[in-house]
Design a protein with these regions (language model features):
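Conserved N-lobe ATP-binding subsite of Hanks-type protein kinase domains
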Residues: 19
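AlphaC helix of the eukaryotic protein kinase fold
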Residues: 38-59
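Activation-segment/catalytic-loop signature of the eukaryotic protein kinase fold
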Residues: 71
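Conserved short submotifs of the Hanks-type protein kinase catalytic core
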Residues: 77-91
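Activation segment signature within eukaryotic-like protein kinase domains
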Residues: 109-110
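Protein kinase catalytic-loop region centered on the HRD/HxD motif
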Residues: 115-125
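C-terminal lobe helix-coil module of Hanks-type protein kinase domains
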Residues: 117, 166-272
Length: 292
């Protein structure tokens, strides 16, 4: 199968917004990843909107943003596509299936993601779907944010669509159908950060209605409740990201990154398990006497 000049080698992922294929660029002789979108995006006003927004996304340059190489609409099949750098790695959601992530690594990744979002926001690009499935961790430990603007690109309606993405990472204004801005992405990143260090989503529930209700009205337990070894100040960072009122969140992604980078470099000292009686102290004293 061929799309444009690119040879499709295999489909490596399928999601709500399309399919991703490992592909070969014969002109340059390199592997690339191609995202294939529904054909509906190639007709009418949707076609022009797809091309315009893809051009904006293609201007984003940051070490933690997947690089967009090319875009087009295949003449033979009328399939819209984006051509991106191909990287070996795993999506963050698959890594989180194994449990929480060490704090220093999680906070460093989150700081890089915040820095990447800052670059996009300055260009007027809102991600709109920040979640672990859209974060790639490469085999050499780098973090890459994927699918910038893809939630809007994949919408068949030219108007803003309030409910796209994954409910557990929606912000309150998204649920209420209000306008979203850069601070909406920071709410979603706060959910991801909470999940990375605790292994738990802060607004999880058994139903869509339950999740939305929690996002709108509940205050989650601080991350330190599940992970007491977290450094002082981290709970406040997450709490600020998850504020219901956007004006109470970080004003910019750069401000969030500036708070996260120092925390990522801070050593985490695991707390000793609490002693329920005096036996632990007596046992330690006995060992010291025996070794004397």
């Amino acid at each position: 199968m061929q799309v444009g000049r690119y040879e499709i080698l295999e489909i490596i992922g399928t999601g709500a917004h399309g399919r991703v294929a490992r592909s070969h660029d014969p002109l340059i002789g390199r592997l690339v990843a191609i995202k294939l979108f529904p054909k509906e995006l190639a007709s009418g006003a949707a076609r022009q909107r797809f091309l315009q927004e893809a051009r904006v996304v293609g201007q984003l340059s940051h070490p933690s943003i997947i690089t967009l190489h090319d875009m087009g609409i295949d003449e033979a099949t009328q399939t819209p596509y984006l051509v991106m750098e191909f990287l070996e790695g795993q999506p963050l959601d698959r890594i989180l299936e194994k449990g929480s992530i060490p704090f220093s690594r999680a906070s460093a990744w989150a700081a890089e993601l915040a820095s990447a979002l800052g670059v996009a926001h300055r260009k007027g690009v809102i991600h709109g779907d920040v979640k672990p499935a859209n974060v790639l961790i490469t085999d050499d430990g780098r973090v890459k944010l994927m699918d910038f603007g893809m939630a809007r690109l994949a919408s068949r309606d030219s108007a803003a669509t309030p409910l796209v993405g994954t409910p557990a990472y929606w912000c309150p204004e998204q649920i209420m159908g209000k306008p979203q801005d850069a601070r909406s992405d920071l709410f979603s990143l706060g959910v991801v950060l909470h999940e990375m260090v605790t292994g738990q989503r802060p607004f999880d529930a058994d139903s869509l209605q339950g999740i939305c209700g929690r996002v709108l009205s509940s205050t989650p337990l601080p991350p330190s409740h599940a992970n007491p070894s977290l450094p002082t100040g981290f709970d406040e960072v997450v709490s600020r990201c998850l504020a219901k009122d956007p004006s109470a969140r970080y004003a910019t992604a750069e401000a969030l990154a500036q708070d996260l980078y120092p925390l990522a470099r801070r050593k985490v000292i695991p707390q000793a398990p609490p002693q329920t009686n005096g036996n632990g102290l007596r046992d330690r004293a006995a060992r010291l006497l025996r070794s004397a």
